[in-house]
């Protein structure tokens, strides 16, 4: 006969274990099944680390694995049997885009809002947004989890040059999405190399990689004994006299004491780097790059994937996506994703752009979305609005005088700028405002019902000085 109870070692708010049966009897040379019920309410997870472990290493915030552990104990008067349990627990999401293809209107710079659907148990789910650089087919011959975690599915790039206006102040963001999750992004477990050729001679000049603070301090990414839980974006092969590594920021952009970016048990990552650290300036603004991924140290760092070289100019992004949190590519996945697309540039250079979104909190079932951008949407009446947009707005796609657009009669009044547009019965509208086309548009309060044939709106909250840009949305 045994009494059953639980000894908890590491706990997490919202997680628990229940033993429906508290006593069992096991006859000689037989066995009994003991039910154990694990339950979790991710809304209660407090995402705090082990209180006995320092929150910082070398004054850098560390990332945490949120775990629970303990023992299920079977005891009687003469003996105790202990069955250990351990689990990694985190609040997850099921976010995804509502559209896989968007037709762009006939304008040079197009502002877009990408809507996301799905739930999130995490209070601050993150999604990062990039210009798609390339996709890589799934290697179905790989069977080991360590190899699958290095199999590239998609990669992307972004630049905040449209916001900074200076190469010296520009940050470049690289995105990698793989077929399976790594346990953690240490190079001896998963070894990504974002390889960069800045002089176009076919030789790699720099490599961007994930690394821990310990490996950076020791100037060696390969020794597991140097590893810790402060994850960085590291530039390798920088031509410096003393060291071969340069710290260029946190992996996934934010320090973990600001945002939970889920570096552990994930298959997506973001590697940021200041453009100047690649030797770029106002005269030299472009480079070639690719992704090379290697498997685990225990298998001899086998090459798992190698993409084609892609050219990128930090001053000429087609997809402008650095409108996220703190002016980065990281967004709150509970809010619409605001980006801009330089359709004119894409048309001039013959590019077929797409948007890559990485879902950092999602379960492994859906970690990325790709949204194709159609540059030549159907526009039968050549009024600058696509037929699909006109049908949605209620205007006539065959009549160039019937178009959902701000009218030239809009003017400045003593109360503020007056905006006019053709309206259609039964529709409603929202007004958005921005100080420049390179900035995200702000939605002004209030849903405006249609007053056909014309709607008039006065922006009484507009700043008195400076240029303003407006647009009208039909939600």
Task: List where the protein language model places each region.
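Long, low-complexity ectodomains and other extracytoplasmic segments of secretory-pathway proteins
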Residues: 1, 5-7, 65, 74-122
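Aromatic/hydrophobic beta-strand junction motif of beta-rich domains
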Residues: 1, 36, 174-176, 419-423
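Short acidic, flexible loop segments centered on an aromatic residue
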Residues: 1-14, 88, 192-198
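Intrinsically disordered, low-complexity Pro/Gly/Ser/Thr-rich segments with frequent PxxP/GP/PP motifs
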Residues: 15-59
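Short proline/glycine- and polar residue-rich coil/turn motifs
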Residues: 23-32, 261-265, 448-453
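A short beta-strand micro-motif common to beta-rich folds, especially ectodomain repeats
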Residues: 50-76
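Surface-exposed extracytoplasmic segments
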Residues: 109-376
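Short, composition-biased motifs enriched in small/polar/acidic residues
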Residues: 376-475
